Amino acid sequence: MVRQVPFPELEFEQPIPRRLVHRAAVAEVFVTDAVELSRDRYLVAAQWPRDHALYHPDPSGLADPLLFAETIRQGLVYLAHSRLGVPLAHRFVGTHMDFRITHPERLRVGAAPPAVVLDAELSRPGDRPPHRHGLRLDAVLLVDGVPCGRGGLSLFATDERRYRLLRGPIGRPAADGDPAPDPGGGRGGGPGG
């Protein structure tokens, strides 16, 4: 079954390169495309898996709403690299995220993946390039062209040296003598990737 795509200008065929959203595996990449509507407004296309190692449908067959949160994160990181020129080596640190599903029935998992689109506004609060990029993405979630949620993410991107200063040395003993955990397995995990 092929769904009618309400945004013909967007591609949904394959994910973008995983390095552009700081993911280790292609299966973790949901964003497929983005188009600029105006200076700070974008449409970001995504394809959500019907099931996933981290995101499972609930017993009633609705997609995990955390897919929306991860799509916002990936959309912001992708736009930062592809449209704003934030270097690929920069680390992202999330500072605030909020999201709300307004019409959960639109998240029903069907025979074919839905056309997921973020109608997104990108702003740059606290921006101080080239070493620190303050970014915020506010998005309306559209599933098959119908609005069904809204959310936003604030983060900043910084170079490796400043990131290490902020986070401290990995593996340094904590106050109780145990080594501090590696935040993200050494690859920039957490909300910002």
Please place each PLM-identified region on the residue numbering:
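A generic structural signal for short, non-catalytic loop/turn and secondary-structure boundary residues
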Residues: L37-R39, H90-G94, V146
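Short, low-complexity, polar/charged sequence segments that are solvent-exposed and flexible
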Residues: L62-L66, L118-A120, I170-A174
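Active-site helix/loop of acyl-thioester processing domains in fatty-acid/polyketide metabolism
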Residues: A63-A89
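Hydrophobic beta-sheet segments that form the core/acyl-binding groove
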Residues: M97-V146
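Mixed-charge, glycine-accented linear interaction segment located at domain edges/termini
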Residues: G126-A174
